[in-house]
Amino acid sequence: MHLQTYGKSYIIRLYASWHAKKGEKREFKEEWLMVTAVVGANWGDEGKGKITDMLGEESDIIVRFQGGSNAGHTIVNDYGKFALHILPSGVFYDHTTSIIGNGVALNIPDLFREINDIVNQGVPKPKILVSDRAQIVMPYHVLFDQYEEERLAGKSFGSTKSGIAPFY
């Protein structure tokens, strides 16, 4: 296992191997599959999106495994400047498949809005897979979030009013 640190975010490189069968004889072959995980040690604003974007150029698959449309990461590239909230940074690379995992609080209208926004700015239509176990943020989650902010009137807890607090 190889560990690199970038500020308060960590990149962990994991290596796996497997063995293959050849007839009756079982032979062991080393095959290296490199997985790079970008994990934040704080509550955001650590540069995870920027690091993921930098690593994306060399990656085949980029997975967004958790979070929702309340947070975001800004990417500046040859296509322009983008604020992504749901989409993984890999959407800017033709060769990359972006996966939205089952831990994501998925707001479907936000997802389609982001896809349309990047495509309208000249980004090729991305290859995206969404887990069939991704949980859906419903309109009532957003309403509950907005109502709670109104109820607290000035003593708000700093919600983005995107439904994340009631969702979780």
Model-derived features with residue positions:
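Short, positively charged and aromatic/hydrophobic N-terminal segments
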Residues: 2, 6, 10-22, 30
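Non-transmembrane, aqueous-exposed alpha-helical and coiled segments at domain scale
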Residues: 33-168
